[in-house]
Amino acid sequence: MINVLIVDDDAMVAELNRLYVARVPGFRCSGSASTLSQAQEMINDPQQEIDLVLLDVYMQQDSGLDLLPTIRESGRGIDVIMITSAADAATVQTAMHYGVVDYLIKPFQ
């Protein structure tokens, strides 16, 4: 089972992501966070089972990019998929530098 953490400050988008994850065999939503500090606490908690993070870039008070070093430094081998409207080259390059496994640009067609 792949345990997914959803990090998005938009409650509706987070819920849609949760519903989608629930429909995919072998995946389950292990939690969600609406702020980077909540996400950091979950990632740094060894009791939390997290294999994959679905991460937004544009959040009200933060940038999801700021969470990427925390994820890498945790040493837990957590994969990241960015799901965001941020389509500029610098943001994509920064995300790729930190080893995100995919970068999906909203809105989807």
Descriptions of predicted regions:
Residues 59:
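Receiver (REC) domain active-site loop signature in two-component systems and cognate sites
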Residues 106-107:
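A Lys-centered signature of the CheY-like receiver
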Residues 56, 84:
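Active-site residues of response regulator receiver
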Residues 32-52:
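Acidic, metal-coordinating helix/loop segments flanking the phosphotransfer/catalytic sites
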Residues 35, 63-66:
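Acidic catalytic/metal-coordinating carboxylates
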Residues 2, 11-34:
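Two-component/phosphorelay signaling modules centered on CheY-like receiver
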Residues 41, 65-77, 94:
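Short amphipathic alpha-helix used as the core "switch/output" element in two-component signaling
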